């Protein structure tokens, strides 16, 4: 445990921001550089089957220390950070024994305020690690990596703690939805696994959104504005008309819990051609289909009213709710709950308003719920993490390994 924070601070110095505009895997060279460091650390630990492929998938195994059969289990985290904010030159700040109030981030005007982020009210007395207000922190998901390796170190240093084979996997490009694309489940070797990619202490998640992306392309007619009457069709106006027809009360900023949404995420505007990029989210598969059908209906209605110009819709499913793949194995969830309770952590079972590698992996034959890291406000400059919650995550990982062995002994 003594090296947990040191590991984390070392890991966040690596710029591993993934790039959605690059097709190759990994999408950024920094991820491979970071993977090489982690590979060497795992070799130094004496782990077996340490492999790093050309795409940045890093795997290893801590062999069983018992003389009876225990199902191999896995722990997974991702090496990339989100494209939403810079992950270069991360300069973490320490806030020891936080007692409330605003936290100044660096030398600028940015602050971390409990008014805006009420979770801080519950963290009095905690040691916090924040950003300096210019980058994200990278707790998503380098905290998960540090916690997994710290748990492995604890198991190695305490051979009296029984465990079966522990499989470790670190993936690239999770933040751009590709983390499971080239993951070799058979090679990984676990019967089930846990991603260590959640937020506050106690989070245990085995439900996530069903997800799709939608590109709406508006084809206009460009004519010199001086002679445009009755001829021009401005694709930007078509795009604006379409967005106005979308449900205003079903967006990320107006929904919570099990409520789905449409999210206008990107746009390219021009007279002859405009394009709007959406993501569609719903916890129910039928609800996802209804949302897709609504967008198609709006497109069809617009096309029916156009004499010139047209609207085109392309929808691609991204991932599905892992619940249907995890629920048939209730012992996986029960084991994590028991481990948390044994570590004085109250399990907080809640849906993931997003996705994880585990969602895709669950549909690839590796049931894979998600467990907390202790981090908050991922993907932005107000990201921070509690050291005490990081330590609890390590203990929960160790306890899961121990309970798995004891239940099969």
UniProtKB/Swiss-Prot annotation:
NCBIfam families: peptidase-T, PRK05469.1, PRK13381.1. Belongs to the peptidase M20B family. Zn(2+) 1 binds at residues 78, 140, 197. GO terms for cellular component: cytosol. CDD domains: M20_peptT. It comes from Vibrio parahaemolyticus serotype O3:K6 (strain RIMD 2210633). It is found in: Cytoplasm. GO terms for biological process: peptide catabolic process; proteolysis. Zn(2+) 2 binds at residues 140, 175, 379. The keyword Hydrolase applies. The active site is at residues 80, 174. Binds 2 Zn(2+) ions per subunit. PROSITE patterns: ARGE_DAPE_CPG2_1, ARGE_DAPE_CPG2_2. It comes from the Bacteria. Cleaves the N-terminal amino acid of tripeptides. Its cofactor is Zn(2+). This is Peptidase T. Its EC number is 3.4.11.4. It catalyses: Release of the N-terminal residue from a tripeptide.
